[in-house]
Swiss-Prot record:
Gene label: metXA
Predominant location category: cytoplasm
GO CC annotation: cytoplasm
InterPro entries: AB_hydrolase_1, AB_hydrolase_fold, HAT_MetX-like
EC number(s) on file: 2.3.1.31
Claim: Lyase is one of the keywords in the record: no
Binding-site positions, substrate: 238, 368
Keyword Transferase annotated: yes
Family: Belongs to the AB hydrolase superfamily. MetX family.
Protein name: Homoserine O-acetyltransferase
């Protein structure tokens, strides 16, 4: 189990709650007459979307890139995180002179609907009751997230996105953008993702959800009202999920069977091994910044994702006659979204007549490779965007 050190400090808990309703980022608010239609049949209104921008939008509004974050990410791509104080989660890719060059592009990232960093979700206050939504919040889907993002892009006055970029759950959003709004996406970079969640991945998510709900402090999702927090359950969920983001080779290289601050086993259930200590740290640090109910909602949204299901089971039909340029990226050691999933996406894109390139990057870093310092990946992303930019006229215009 996660040890006692995983209990969030009052300061972190208070700041996390504050960010849910009043984030330290830009906020687009949508009133009751601007509802967000959800796949479950409910119109969500009012609601808000928290977002960050980097760089400047050019006069022609042709240089906007939307970054879509993964399951446990948020809008703080390339700035210091307001809760943890750590650098943004994709500072390796976004910034001046980087593949998503903020001297050239206008980069946008919003917290997804259902998240816990300022966009409306289960951690937000329900305006009808004045209390936290909790499980009264409607179940959301990846298409719902994208629909909300499209409303934000409308609010920003942008008709067409130069590119939509994201990995994992973010990659699912990228693909959904291309299906739902093909005329609004000039280029797309879906990374380490799939067009539907596999049975294995659904099973991993259910394990995490059950860990959260088995924690007595979850209180049927009413932990905020009752002054508790399911830190143990959420910490275990994070530990289990984090294993799937890595690879056996990466774990062996980093930890092997080395002991943690000792030479001999304690013959107890302390963290004897370095890998145990590492996982406990991952669990304890996660609960300081993330809402447990949001974890339930976002994992469920990923589970429901299946592009082909809305096209009579024919994936290629979803991309038929698309004009979007694609670069699909996978990693050899990613067993959460293996290369076979990316190849299936590429085959469907080819069958639909799309312009698509595909790169499988050799690495032992697992699924999370897209978040790490990986020069080969950076080179591919950079080359793809430069090529697309030339076609769009960005380079020729000196923008």
């Amino acid at each position: 189990m996660v040890n006692a050190q995983s209990v969030p400090t009052p300061a972190h808990a208070e700041y996390r709650a504050q960010e849910a309703d009043h984030p330290t980022s830009q906020v687009a608010m949508f009133a009751g007459d601007q509802p967000l239609p959800l796949d479950c049949g409910i119109d969500l209104a009012p609601f808000q979307i928290a977002y960050q921008t980097y760089g400047e939008l050019n006069a022609g509004k042709s240089n906007a890139i939307l970054v879509c974050h993964a399951l446990t990410g948020d809008q703080h791509v390339a700035n210091v995180h307001p809760v943890t104080g750590k650098p943004g989660w994709w500072v390796t890719l976004v910034g001046p002179g980087k593949p998503l060059d903020t001297d050239k592009y206008f980069v946008i990232c919003s917290n997804v609907i259902g998240g816990c960093m300022g966009s409306t979700g289960p951690a937000s206050t329900n305006p009808a009751t004045g209390t936290v939504w909790g499980l009264d919040f409607p179940v959301i889907t990846i298409p719902d997230m994208v629909r909300a993002q499209a409303m934000l892009i409308d609010r920003l006055g942008i008709d067409t996105l130069f590119s939509v970029v994201g990995g994992s759950m973010g990659g699912m959003q990228v693909l959904q953008w291309c299906v739902a709004y093909p005329q609004r996406v000039f280029s797309a970079l879906p990374i380490a993702c799939s067009t539907r969640h596999s049975a294995q991945n659904i099973a991993f998510h259910e394990l995490g959800r059950q860990a959260v709900m088995a924690d007595p402090d979850w209180r049927d999702g009413r932990y905020v009202e009752q002054g508790t927090y399911p830190h143990r359950g959420l910490g275990v969920a994070r530990m289990a999920a984090h294993i799937t983001y890595l690879s056996d080779a990466a774990l062996h290289r980093k930890f092997g069977r080395r002991m943690q601050d000792r030479d001999l086993p304690t013959f107890s259930f302390d963290a004897d091994f370095q890998v145990e200590s590492y996982l406990r740290h991952q669990g304890s640090s996660f609960v300081e910044r993330f809402d447990a109910n949001s974890y339930l909602y976002l994992t469920r949204a990923m589970d429901y994702f299946d592009i082909a299901a809305d096209h009579n089971g024919v994936l290629a039909a979803a991309f038929r006659d698309t004009r979007t340029r694609f670069c699909v990226v996978s990693f050899t050691s990613d067993w959460l979204f293996p290369t076979s999933e990316s190849r299936a996406t590429v085959h469907a894109l080819n069958a639909g007549g799309a312009r698509v390139s595909f790169a499988e990057i050799e690495t032992d870093r697992g699924h999370d490779a897209f978040l790490l310092d990986l020069p080969e990946f950076f080179d591919i992303a950079h080359a793809f965007l430069v090529s697309a930019g030339k076609t769009r006229g960005l380079a020729a215009a000196g923008e």
